[in-house]
Each structure stands twice: as structure tokens, then as C-alpha cells.
């Protein structure tokens, strides 16, 4: 098998490895959670900070109106209890979600194995490329080599044509010889038959 074919086979193999890697990653990768409790807490803190900043800006813009308005009354006890119950329910739901989500029990090592396979295949491809003739030559040198190869090809083609002509002539001579021999043998048989009678 020539180097170009081997190189093509290895490139096809590398493409197959990449496709397999993507499939394995889609199939076996551990789940990633976008709505984890830490992100939710950070979002709540950011919202509270934004609300506080907005309130401070409003107070700075309208200090007289803020002084005239009495502070809001505290919420009734029933409303406070409802808010506490809602918070507890949310916390319980988050805990249940965390328990239901599968936790990776062992380290997932498929990416490192696939990366090694890609690296090994790439090294083989590089070695094939380095073995290609003319890889270290300039464009002019490669052009000269191609001209020489073309000249050699024409010479070989001419030699092939002349040997073909010679073979055709030899074949004609062999056919003529066979025909001559067969006619002579017939004539001898004919000559021998009258003698026998």
C-alpha cells in the first residue's frame, strides 16, 4: 500500500475517532446543572442589591417625599407565616432535586482516553507526511523533478510501443511458421498416401 493511501486511511480513522468522541461525550458525560442552588442564591442576592440601590437612588432624588411618608407597617403575622412556609417549601424542593440528581461516583476518564487516541493518530499522520517524497523540497525543485519524471515516462512509453511492435512482428512470424509447418505436414501426408496404395 502506498503512502498516499495509508495517509488517507489514517485521516479517515481520525475523522472516525472524532465522531466517536462526540458520540461518547453526548452519551456518557456527567450532567451539568444550570439551576443549582448556589446560582439561585447569587441571583437572589444580586436582585436584593439592585432593589436596595434603586431605593437609595429614589431616596436621594426625592428626600422630601420620603420624609413625609410614614414607614410601611409590618406585614400581618399570617402573611409572615405564609412567607416562611413558602421559603421552607422552596428549600425542601431544592433538597429533593439535589437528592434526585445523580452524583458522579467515580471519575470520568473517557475524555483522556479519547484524547490519547487522537494524539496517536495525529502522530502517525505526521510521520506519513514527512515520509512523502519532495516534502522538504522547494517548489522549483519539485517542478524539475516532475519534468524529469515526465521525460522518463515518455521514454518508457516509447520503449513500450517499440517492444509492442516487435512482439506483433514476432507473432506474425510465428503464425507464418506454424502455417508453413502445417502445410508441409499436409503435403507429406498426401505424398505418403499414394505410395501406400
UniProtKB/Swiss-Prot annotation:
Biological classification of the source: Eukaryota, Amoebozoa, Evosea, Eumycetozoa, Dictyostelia
Protein's name in the database: Putative mediator of RNA polymerase II transcription subunit 21
GO cellular-component term (any): mediator complex
Entry-linked SUPFAM superfamilies: Mediator hinge subcomplex-like
UniProt KW keywords: Activator, Coiled coil, Nucleus, Transcription, Transcription regulation
A Pfam family reported for this protein in Swiss-Prot or TrEMBL: Med21
Molecular function GO terms recorded: transcription coregulator activity
Subunit structure: Component of the Mediator complex.
GO-annotated biological processes: regulation of transcription by RNA polymerase II
Purpose: Component of the Mediator complex, a coactivator involved in the regulated transcription of nearly all RNA polymerase II-dependent genes. Mediator functions as a bridge to convey information from gene-specific regulatory proteins to the basal RNA polymerase II transcription machinery. Mediator is recruited to promoters by direct interactions with regulatory proteins and serves as a scaffold for the assembly of a functional preinitiation complex with RNA polymerase II and the general transcription factors.
Chain residue ranges for the region called Disordered: 29-110
Family per record: Belongs to the Mediator complex subunit 21 family.
Subcellular location, principal: nucleus
Coiled coil: 38-101
Originating species: Dictyostelium discoideum (Social amoeba)
